[in-house]
Amino acid sequence: LHITKKLPEFTSPKFIVSVDKQFRHAVECNHTATHLLNLSLRSTLGNHIQQKGSRVSDKNLRFDFSHFEKIEKNTLDKIEDNINDLIEKEIGLEVQTDVPTKKALKMGAIGIFGEKYGDKVRTVKFGESYELCGGTHVNNSKELWRFKIINETAIASGIRRIEAITNYSLKEYYNHKLKEFDSINHLLNNPVDVVETIKNLKDQSNKLKK
């Protein structure tokens, strides 16, 4: 059900309402990913993690949360791996509507700190992820395909931000990286070990600079 605050000026003609299915599905994937990210952050870094904001689009997602220090690469990899494990487990969506807010919180549902909720709320559950949420989601975690963290940074004292992609944008990202790799491989005359070749070239360059 969609509710609009403003009707067209002329309501007598017929209107065709359509949904961009891929756009909507991409948004659903990224929204569900914020829930799985929240769960993974709490399980990896600790229960001090609190959501401070988020933005979801068809292209990507960003998630702001309380944390006191920069997250190291190996920890980010662990968070990412945890989410991809949840995706591979094919966890189904469970939604409950008109749940008394106090009851939902008592049952362990997580809300946004400082957010004011009504007497009744909608809850969204993916396995151990259980949140108060009114947004649109995928029916199963497998629809995300994969999850990739693109950036992690500080946006204020004690607040970090993670930017990530899933599904359609991630496929485009991988295709772009594969083309880049092919170009590098071609420039280096198709070596057996590309990484080792680049390291050797870097060492030679450093020696020449001396």
Where are these regions (language model features)?
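A glycine- and charged-residue-rich anion-binding loop/surface
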Residues: 1-210
